[in-house]
């Protein structure tokens, strides 16, 4: 039972650390690119636009594309950096690309130019 409690505490600690990391990443990124969310949303069809909840700075989608904006385009690296599976990153990337207002094949290039 003690081992189990330690395991749960450890998992909670990792979750808390990851959330703290996300928060610091988001704040730093938005300091560098204060108009990123608006500019990113302008690349999407209106009904697909992404808005963070009041308690978060960036959503998972926005965080993935923030990394792409910074030049991290390898899905493996993005998955490792954010602690998601490769399949999750592929799904997010393809879902957002399909919601592009303009040329879907240029979507990620357009993000890099924001």
Describe the residue ranges of each PLM region.
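Short, small-residue-biased leader/transition segments that mark boundaries at the very start
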Residues: 3-4
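Signal-transducing coiled-coil linker helices
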Residues: 14-21
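Cytosolic nucleotide-binding catalytic cores of signal-transduction proteins
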Residues: 23-114
